[in-house]
């Protein structure tokens, strides 16, 4: 078995290649207007295929409809699946030299530098790339960059918890009113949630986690699921800190941020595959994503020159109790990630339930 594994690894290495000593990462810098790129994309066929990390099939329907309304005649075929599965499927396409995807947007930030070094990504700077925070992009090749800041917030239903006026810390969740009221994503099933627990427990220790377990939280798969359950009247659970709903997630839902440990934020990262079948369509999509027009609609912009929509703070870099640059380093340290997964799996058991894409929650 070990000999076969060695042969497989050597074969994989022989089929991959490294661009470092090629000294050829200079990007194409876009100078055309959106309208000019739009007409080029229509001439190409008007189709874009995007794989976007997420845990609900319809999670990017708003992006699809907004884009298609903005650019009549364009079809945005967008598939949502867990980033930890999509990256492997992309590797398979690259291995087989059979790329069918134009654009990828994923949470697995550790993949992008590797793909860039393998020569799998298009070195291309959309208009607005120069405005993106340096920490959120490959400044040399322009092959990848964040397009929106994702983050976990504290969220609760004010109708279900009428006596809770504010939640200002993770320690608050150990109070009696939250007994049987919490719904949380398994940390051993999502690396961004894993990082949330890691950051919290670096400050509050395992004593906090022991106390949290005594509150009998409901553990679920997927990060959209907790907010869905919190929002729905037919579930008793009424608070979470492992979901992303922006600053105004819905009626009767209040959002707050902790003061006793950092919350997780990161730039959800995008790239165009070098052998994308619809390169002009992909360029249109990425220029739109980094445009001021689109960036003004997201909760927290990746651009330095745009104030965040709905945030009490001017930008992500001046938001207290978070550091959007550290998640990428965490994701690169797969040894630590695996050790933490097993720690939580030992305490909680393996993640139970159907994939969040098909569980109808």
For each predicted feature, which ranges?
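Extracytoplasmic "Venus flytrap"
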Residues: 17-34, 44-62
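Extracytoplasmic ligand-binding site segments that recognize negatively charged/polar headgroups
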Residues: 49-65, 77-87, 91, 98-235
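Short amphipathic alpha-helical coupling segments at ligand-binding clamshell hinges
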Residues: 63, 208, 268, 277-289, ...
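A ligand-binding cleft/hinge motif common to bilobed small-molecule-binding domains
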Residues: 110-114, 234-256
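Periplasmic-binding protein-like
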Residues: 133-136, 149-151, 209-213, 219-220, ...
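A bilobed periplasmic-binding-protein/Venus flytrap-type ligand-binding module shared by bacterial periplasmic
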Residues: 153-160, 266-278, 297-301
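Extracellular/periplasmic juxtamembrane helices and adjacent flexible linkers that interface
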Residues: 288, 292-361
């Amino acid at each position: 078995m070990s000999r076969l594994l060695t042969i497989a690894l050597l074969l994989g290495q022989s089929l991959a290649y490294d661009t470092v000593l090629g000294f050829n990462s200079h990007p194409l810098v876009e100078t055309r207007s959106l309208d000019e790129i739009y007409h080029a994309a229509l001439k190409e066929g008007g189709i874009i295929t995007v794989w976007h990390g997420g845990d609900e099939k319809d999670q990017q329907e708003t992006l699809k409809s907004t884009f298609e309304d903005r650019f009549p005649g364009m079809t945005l075929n967008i598939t949502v699946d867990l980033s930890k599965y999509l990256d492997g499927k992309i590797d398979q396409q690259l291995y087989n030299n059979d790329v069918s995807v134009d654009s990828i947007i994923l949470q697995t930030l550790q993949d992008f530098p590797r793909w860039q070094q393998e020569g799998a990504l298009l070195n291309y700077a959309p208009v607005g790339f120069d405005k993106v925070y340096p920490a959120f992009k490959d400044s040399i090749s322009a092959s990848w960059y964040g397009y929106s800041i994702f983050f976990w917030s504290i969220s609760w239903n004010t109708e279900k918890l009428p006596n809770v006026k504010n939640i200002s810390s993770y320690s608050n969740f150990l109070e009696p009113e939250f007994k049987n009221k919490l719904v949380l994503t398994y940390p051993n099933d999502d690396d961004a949630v894993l990082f949330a627990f890691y950051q919290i427990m670096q400050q509050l220790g395992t004593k906090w986690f022991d106390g949290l377990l005594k509150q009998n939280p409901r553990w679920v798969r997927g990060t959209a699921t907790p907010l869905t359950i919190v929002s729905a009247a037919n579930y008793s659970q009424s608070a979470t800190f492992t979901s992303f709903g922006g600053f105004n997630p819905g009626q009767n839902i209040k959002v707050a941020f902790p003061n006793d440990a950092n919350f997780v934020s990161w730039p959800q990262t995008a790239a165009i595959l070098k052998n994308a079948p619809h390169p002009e369509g992909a360029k249109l999509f990425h220029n739109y994503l980094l445009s001021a027009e689109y960036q003004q609609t997201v909760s927290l912009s990746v651009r330095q020159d745009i104030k965040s929509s709905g945030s009490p703070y001017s930008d992500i870099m001046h938001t207290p109790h978070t550091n959007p640059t550290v998640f990428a380093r965490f994701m690169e340290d797969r040894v630590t990630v695996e050790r933490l997964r097993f720690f939580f799996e030992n305490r909680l058991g393996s993640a139970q339930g159907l994939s969040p894409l098909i569980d109808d929650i």
